[in-house]
Every structure is written in structure tokens, then in C-alpha cells.
């Protein structure tokens, strides 16, 4: 490979061009050098891995495998039983950050590689299926890789891993895609990380159960797996898991030495991907950060992605009951459905047919979304210039979601529905929608928590939450890890379930700062029916409806309602048979805020619940609300946050209901009470008013509104106190405060 190639972006033509510098020249003016950055960075430590015949990779055979990068099974089970040291990885990543530009590639090689002593390695990109690219994209990647590494053998290994052969002039032949740019497989795919006994402790960054597909050309494609995928994580530390396929579509006009690719141009470059079903099993002695049980797709530059899981997704979390270290058994951040991202005026849609099932047997589990996640955002800047300006349209759909939360687990921030996030700037429009037909959440736990554990929980919250804010603000990642380690150790108390949401979330963020900014940011979440059952446990802060958040950065001259977040739940059933339950509402949550809290922003957050039925037959409840909660942090002249509930029926046949002890909330959260109230002051005042030092509320039939532009409405309230014991005050109506 004696030729020297360069990838450039021609502004005048609006196209990527690949030139042979030995035969062509490109004027520097009006061009920008662009090397397939994602591939090059990923490949900084070497070529793709060659899978051993038995499919098992260990520290001992990594030298024969050749690299730690981009292992693919192509239908054969891939088993990773390497060993890695998290502290070493953090130290190496810090070295990458601190390195001079010319030394960053070498630092990356060290961070994402393996040592000669065979006691530390980091695996990057493990795939049960295939690494797929169309020929144009593979050639762009090969040129970028050759430019970065100056190593022809690396390029040849890369090409072989994507099904191609490459000659000395970088001509490619072969590939896994057929003549119609499609790929179909009837083979099941499987990835296994670690072992149940924990004799291996891999570090793995990026696991895909299905296949990867990357394209920068304007070729339409179909990626179909007529079988299921399974990812099993038994030990080690794993970040970034996709149960289905991972697809990235960023179409460009491609020119090789001034000649086009010959591809027919479509109105929108389209990609369809499908898989039969997916299963994600997390257990043993593992830790997992960030998973998507279904597909993950990113559409840019005016493209369109359509993904489906034909027959459901399953997530099982069950760690070893004995022999766990204090920091084993941790899962942070996950989506049980599909995830789609759209930017650059693109469209992305994903559907999960059948049931989505999440079983949490034990461990510490935080931030799990039962439905799908749809994200549209306005990239802007240099990346926006390359990947398409403007926001996009993203949609996810789920049939039914069932989440079973076991008595041996400690959980926080579980959500039954999906999440929709829309972001837009200037004249651009961004929309996101996430829907689910039926959501069921079942919580188990002890009848009561002992007082020592309660003190331990409250102390952990007041000690570490301020530290997290400071660590993030100062970008001190190593200290954040240390503080999170201490926090996780303190809150690992079985049967504690904090911040539970029955419906989905809608988050809209607008940046419309002048009269010419006529765009919109619209996020919608919808669940037809939610059923939540609490049979036991120490359950704190539960809303059966959805969550709507609207954030705006508007000048006083803006008068259009451009930033809207709406979370809808048609029907709610909230059933409490046991446990200790603190601050429950059958309604939804609406929160609106703005960077300029001068009363001019008309960002709007709306949480709607149709009918809500609450049945209390056992356990204790400290603070039960029938309606929703609306916080307006805009200080608006108009209504910015609304929580609507059509009808509520609360029936008490057993158990005991009291006013809440809100000291754990009001003591650490004070806020600004003078002038324009802050977010903290709204929380503080509402909690104080509800609690024993305020109105001493056991049951509030209506909802809560806090802030000048907040409303909480309810049409019909029915309270049936047929049994049990109510020790404090009962109000059929609602509560309103100014928040400061």
C-alpha cells in the first residue's frame, strides 16, 4: 500500500472527497480534513480481534488474538474471560486527557490495550453478530485507518473483519452485504462476559448482542436477524451494552478522486433493521453501566432509521446471593426497549412488539427505563456542519412492559414507561415521542425497615448528594467514582425502592432567543394504562403518572409557546398491600424552568392522568396524594407547569396512613426563598407544608401546585375510608404555594 490518501470535506460541493495525493491535489481553501474519526479512535490500539476456535478470549491468549478491539462472533458464541483493573483504566484515561495531541494515540493504545504481564486488559467492542459496512464506508474507514496508523496490516485485518479483502491500492472486494445492500441471518447470536464464580473480571467497553452497521454513503440498507440474541454478563465491569443491533447512518455525497460512487440518490437514505427477540442476563459478580435491551440507532444528515424487535425483550438481573464484594452487583442506567437518536433533520423510529420484561431479583439497580427512549437534538457547531444541521424526529413504541422488583434488591429511579427528549435551536424543529400500551410494576420487600437502616439511608443522602454535585461541577471524575463507591456501599439495603415512576417521561429543551427563532421543541410520552403494586419494602417518592419537564432559554421578546413537554397516562391503578410507603401520588409530575427566570418564558410542561384508582389494604403510608404535582420555576406570567387529573378514587380498607416526616427533604434542601424562588425552595416549601410541621397531611385528594405559573387540576375526587387507620388530616382538595 504505497499510495497516500486523504479524506476531505469540500464546502462548495457539500461532499466528502477521497483523493490520492500522488495523482490529485485539493486546495486547502474551502476544504476540511475529515478522517473517519470514530473508526480511527476505536482502532488506535490495533486491528480487529481474531476469535479463537472455541470463542473464548482470556488474558493468556490475547497475544494470539492480536488485539482487544472489535471482536465479532458472526453467529458463534463469544466468551470474554479476561481480567482488568478499573483503577488502572481510570489512571490511563486521565493520562489520555492530559496528553499532548501528538501523544494521544499512544495514550489511547495503552488505555484500551493489554499489558505484557497479562494481568490487565480492556476489551473494546464485542459483538455477537457481524460488523457490517457498505463498500463505500469500508473504503473511507480503511483510508482513515491507514492515515492514522500507517500500518497496512492493520487495514487488512480491519477489512477482513467487515468481510472485505483489500489490495495495495485500497480497492475492496467482498463484504457481508448482498447486491441490494442487505444482510439477512437465521443464526442466533450470543455474548458471554466473565464467569459466575468471578474467577475472571473483564473490563469491556461496548457489547452488542446482534450486529453493528455503519454507513456514510447514500445506500439504503436492510439488516435482518431472523433469530434472537442473548447477552450474559456474569462478572467484571461492563459499560455500554446493546442487546439488539447498533446502527449509525450518516449519508454523504462521496467522491473518490472526483468520481461519484454511482449510488442512486433517494429522497431519504433509509435503513431497516429487525431482530426476533433479545435477552440480557446480568448476574454473578458483575457491574454494568448503561444498557439497551433492544436496538440502538442513530440517524443523522437527513436519513431515516426504522427498527423493530419482533417478539419482545427480556432483562434478568440476579446476582450471586453470597460471596459478593461490597461493590459487586451494581447496575446503573438502562433502557429495556429500543433507543433511537435523530439529528440533522433525520427521522428515527423503533418498535418493540410483544412483552418487555424486567426482573430485578437483587443487587443495587438505578435508572432503568421500562419502555423505549427517543431522542432528537440539534447538534450545531462543527459536528452539526458535518452530520447535518437542525434537530430531528424520534419515536419509540412498546406493547407491554412488566417490571418485577424483588425484595432483595435496592433500587432508585425506576420508570415503567418510555422517555422522550426533544431539543431544538433557532428556526429548527425537534420532536420526540415514546409510547407504551400497558405498564405493570410490582414491588416486594420487608414489612418494615429497621431504624438503623433508615438512619443510614438518610445519612448517605445528605452526605453524598452534595458531593456528587461538586464532583460533576469540578469535572473530577476520579473523585466522583470514589464518592459513588461510598454512596453505593451505604445504600445497599435490600427492599429499599426510591423515586418510582409508573408512566414515562417527556423532556423538552428549547433555545429560542430572538424573534427570528421560530422553531419548536416538542416531547410527548404516553402510556395507556399503568398498574403499580407495592406488597412490601421501604418505598419513597412514587408517582404513578408520568413526568414532564420543559426547559427554555428565551428573551422577554418571545411570545410563542415553543417548548412543550407532555406526559400522558390514561388510566392508573395504584395498589398498596404492605411495606412502608412515603410520599405517594397517583398523578403525574410537571416541572418547567428557564435560564432567564424573568416571567417571559412560555415553556410548558404538562402531566395528564385520566382516571386514577388507589386501593390501600395494608402497610403504612406517610403522605398520600390523589392528584399530580406541578412546579413552575420560570416565575412566569402565564401557566408554565400543569398537572391534570380527571378523576381520583382513594379507597382505604386496611393499613395505616400518616403525615410524612419530611425532615430528610427539608433539612438538606433549602433553596432561595427571597426574590425569584429557586427549584430547591419549591421542594422545601411543598414538603414542609405537607409534613407534620405544616398541614399534617395524611391524605390529599387533589394535587399540588408550586410557583406563580403552576396549576394542578382535578375534576372529581372520591374518598372511601372503609377501614384501616388514618392518624392525621384528610383533605379532599389540593395544595398551592408560591414556593418562596
Predicted regions and their residues:
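Surface-exposed loop/turn motifs in large extracellular/passenger domains
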Residues: 51-206, 211-240, 245-367, 373-584, ...
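Gram-negative bacterial Sec-dependent N-terminal signal peptides
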Residues: 4, 8-49
Amino acid at each position: 500500500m504505497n499510495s497516500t490518501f486523504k479524506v476531505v470535506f469540500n464546502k462548495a460541493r457539500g461532499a466528502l472527497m477521497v483523493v490520492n495525493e500522488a495523482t490529485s491535489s485539493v486546495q486547502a481553501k474551502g476544504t476540511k480534513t475529515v478522517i473517519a474519526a470514530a473508526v480511527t479512535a476505536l482502532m488506535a490500539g490495533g486491528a480487529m480481534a481474531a476469535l479463537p476456535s472455541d470463542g473464548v478470549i482470556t488474558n493468556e491468549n490475547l497475544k494470539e488474538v492480536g488485539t482487544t478491539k472489535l471482536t465479532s462472533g458472526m453467529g458463534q458464541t463469544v466468551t470474554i474471560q479476561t481480567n482488568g483493573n478499573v483503577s488502572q483504566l481510570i489512571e490511563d484515561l486521565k493520562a489520555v486527557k492530559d496528553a499532548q495531541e501528538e501523544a494521544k494515540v499512544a495514550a489511547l493504545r495503552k488505555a484500551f490495550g493489554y499489558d505484557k504481564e497479562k494481568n490487565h486488559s480492556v476489551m473494546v467492542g464485542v459483538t455477537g453478530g457481524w460488523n457490517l459496512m457498505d463498500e463505500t464506508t469500508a473504503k473511507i474507514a480503511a483510508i482513515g485507518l491507514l492515515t492514522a496508523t500507517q500500518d497496512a496490516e492493520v487495514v487488512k485485518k480491519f477489512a477482513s473483519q467487515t468481510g472485505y479483502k483489500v489490495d495495495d491500492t485500497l480497492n475492496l472486494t467482498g463484504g457481508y452485504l448482498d447486491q441490494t445492500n442487505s444482510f439477512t441471518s437465521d443464526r442466533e447470536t450470543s455474548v458471554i462476559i466473565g464467569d459466575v464464580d468471578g474467577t475472571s473480571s473483564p473490563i469491556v467497553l461496548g457489547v452488542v448482542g446482534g450486529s453493528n452497521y455503519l454507513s456514510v454513503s447514500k445506500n439504503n440498507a436492510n439488516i435482518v436477524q431472523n433469530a434472537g440474541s442473548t447477552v450474559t454478563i456474569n462478572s467484571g465491569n461492563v459499560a455500554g451494552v446493546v442487546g439488539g443491533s447498533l446502527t449509525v447512518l450518516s449519508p454523504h455525497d462521496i467522491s473518490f478522486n472526483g468520481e461519484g460512487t454511482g449510488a442512486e440518490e433517494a429522497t431519504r437514505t433509509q435503513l431497516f433493521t429487525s431482530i426476533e427477540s433479545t435477552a440480557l442476563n446480568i448476574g454473578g459478580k458483575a457491574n454494568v453501566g448503561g444498557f439497551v435491551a433492544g436496538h440502538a440507532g442513530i440517524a443523522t444528515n437527513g436519513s431515516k432509521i426504522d427498527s423493530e424487535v419482533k417478539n419482545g425483550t427480556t432483562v434478568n438481573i440476579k446476582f450471586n446471593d453470597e460471596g459478593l464484594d461490597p461493590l459487586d452487583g451494581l447496575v446503573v442506567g438502562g433502557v429495556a426497549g429500543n433507543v433511537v437518536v435523530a439529528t440533522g433533520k433525520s427521522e428515527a423510529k423503533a418498535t418493540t412488539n410483544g412483552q418487555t420484561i424486567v426482573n430485578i431479583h437483587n443487587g443495587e439497580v438505578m435508572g432503568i427505563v421500562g419502555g423505549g427512549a427517543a431522542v432528537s437534538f440539534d447538534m450545531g457547531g462543527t459536528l452539526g456542519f458535518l452530520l447535518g444541521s437542525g434537530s430531528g424526529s424520534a419515536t419509540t413504541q412498546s406493547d407491554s412492559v412488566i417490571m418485577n422488583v424483588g425484595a432483595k434488591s435496592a433500587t432508585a429511579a425506576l420508570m415503567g414507561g418510555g422517555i422522550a427528549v426533544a431539543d431544538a435551536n433557532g428556526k429548527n424543529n425537534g420532536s420526540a415521542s415514546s409510547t407504551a400500551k400497558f405498564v405493570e410494576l410490582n414491588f416486594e420487600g420487608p414489612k418494615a425497615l429497621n431504624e438503623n437502616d433508615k438512619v443510614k439511608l438518610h445519612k448517605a443522602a445528605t452526605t453524598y448528594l452534595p458531593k456528587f454535585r461538586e464532583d460533576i461541577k469540578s469535572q473530577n471524575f476520579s473523585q466522583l467514582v470514589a464518592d459513588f463507591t461510598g454512596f453505593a456501599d451505604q445504600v445497599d439495603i435490600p427492599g429499599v425502592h426510591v423515586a418510582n415512576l409508573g408512566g414515562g417521561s417527556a423532556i423538552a429543551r428549547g433555545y429560542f432567543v430572538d424573534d427570528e427563532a421560530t422553531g419548536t421543541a416538542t416531547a410527548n410520552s404516553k402510556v395507556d394504562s399503568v398498574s403499580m403494586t407495592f406488597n412490601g419494602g421501604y418505598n419513597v417518592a412514587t408517582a404513578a403518572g408520568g413526568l414532564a419537564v420543559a426547559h427554555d432559554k428565551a428573551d422577554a421578546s418571545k411570545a410563542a409557546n415553543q417548548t412543550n413537554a407532555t406526559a400522558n397516562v390514561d388510566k392508573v391503578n395504584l395498589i398498596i398491600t404492605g411495606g412502608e410507603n412515603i410520599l405517594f401520588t397517583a398523578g403525574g409530575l410537571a416541572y418547567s424552568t428557564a435560564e432567564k427566570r424573568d416571567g417571559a418564558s412560555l415553556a410548558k410542561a404538562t402531566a395528564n392522568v385520566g382516571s386514577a384508582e388507589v386501593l390501600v389494604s395494608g402497610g403504612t403510608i406517610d403522605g398520600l396524594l390523589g392528584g399530580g404535582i406541578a412546579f413552575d420555576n420560570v416565575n412566569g406570567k402565564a401557566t408554565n407547569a400543569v398537572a391534570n387529573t380527571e378523576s381520583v378514587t382513594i379507597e382505604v380498607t386496611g393499613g395505616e396512613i400518616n403525615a410524612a416526616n419530611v425532615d430528610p427533604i427539608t433539612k438538606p434542601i433549602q433553596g432561595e426563598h427571597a426574590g425569584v424562588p429557586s427549584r430547591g425552595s419549591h421542594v422545601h416549601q411543598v414538603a414542609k407544608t405537607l409534613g407534620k410541621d405544616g398541614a399534617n397531611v395524611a391524605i390529599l385528594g387533589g394535587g399540588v401546585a408550586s410557583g406563580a405559573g403552576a396549576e394542578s387540576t382535578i375534576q372529581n375526587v372520591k374518598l372511601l375510608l372503609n377501614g384501616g387507620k388514618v392518624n392525621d388530616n384528610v383533605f379532599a382538595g389540593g395544595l398551592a404555594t408560591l414556593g418562596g
